[in-house]
């Protein structure tokens, strides 16, 4: 008799395969296609678009995330996160604002000296936001999709034959994922991209008007509030936030 962990969960995995498939399209393939089409039609400027993408990659992937990963191995930091949850969430939100808005400001002042129009600001913000979508949501959606497919066809059991406990953990975790949360994750990413465009316009305006510092501070505060609201919602509704 087949007693595999995925037995009886076929319908669940089918729904999740569909949901993760849709998420993978809208958070990985669609952003890439959108940028290619907009550049080809000259609706956006390629240089600010690329700089915006690099601003996110450097500030988050190369700097902030590794620092947080190191801190997460420290007992005092874990204790702080557990005992001071609100302050911990504020810290996460504010550091995202500090790192990303600082990178945005440096990108505009140092690498967009001749490209500071609204079109350039939109291009920069779109690149920043879509890079985040692709790296933090798109890639994980594809990974989860592959896991669900492997669980559905039974190949996951062969892959984890020597690690039944790990297989059980993966199976339980994926079975617990609500398809509603997957779809909400797509909506949340749309709002995040719109925010990145807004924040980029703020930085561009600050640089153009000679008030880069005050506009940068406004962008950091706005970013902190936006992320904090999203993180708090994630605690109660499982909305994805990155």
Regions found by a protein language model. Give the residues of each.
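Hydrophobic alpha-helical segments at protein termini of multi-pass membrane proteins
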Residues: 11-242
């Amino acid at each position: 008799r087949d007693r595999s962990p995925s037995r009886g969960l076929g319908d669940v995995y089918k729904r999740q395969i569909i949901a993760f498939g849709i998420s993978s399209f809208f958070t990985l393939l669609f952003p890439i296609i959108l940028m290619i089409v907009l550049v080809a039609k000259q609706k956006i400027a390629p240089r600010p678009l690329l700089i915006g993408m690099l601003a996110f990659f450097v500030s988050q992937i190369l700097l902030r995330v590794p620092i947080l990963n190191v801190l997460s191995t420290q007992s005092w930091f874990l204790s702080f996160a557990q005992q001071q949850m609100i302050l911990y969430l504020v810290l996460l939100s504010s550091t995202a604002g500090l790192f990303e808005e600082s990178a945005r400001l440096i990108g505009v002042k140092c690498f967009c000296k001749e490209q500071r129009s609204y079109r350039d600001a939109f291009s920069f913000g779109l690149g920043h936001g879509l890079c985040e979508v692709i790296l933090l949501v798109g890639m994980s959606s594809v990974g989860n999709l592959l896991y669900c497919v492997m669980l559905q066809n039974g190949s996951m059991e062969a892959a984890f034959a020597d690690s039944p406990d790990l297989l059980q953990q993966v199976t339980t975790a994926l079975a617990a994922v609500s398809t509603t949360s997957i779809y909400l994750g797509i909506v949340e990413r749309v709002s995040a991209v719109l925010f990145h465009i807004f924040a980029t316009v703020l930085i561009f305006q600050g640089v153009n008007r000679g008030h880069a510092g005050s506009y940068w501070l406004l962008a950091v505060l706005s970013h902190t509030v936006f992320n904090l609201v999203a993180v708090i919602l994630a605690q109660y509704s499982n909305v994805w936030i990155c």
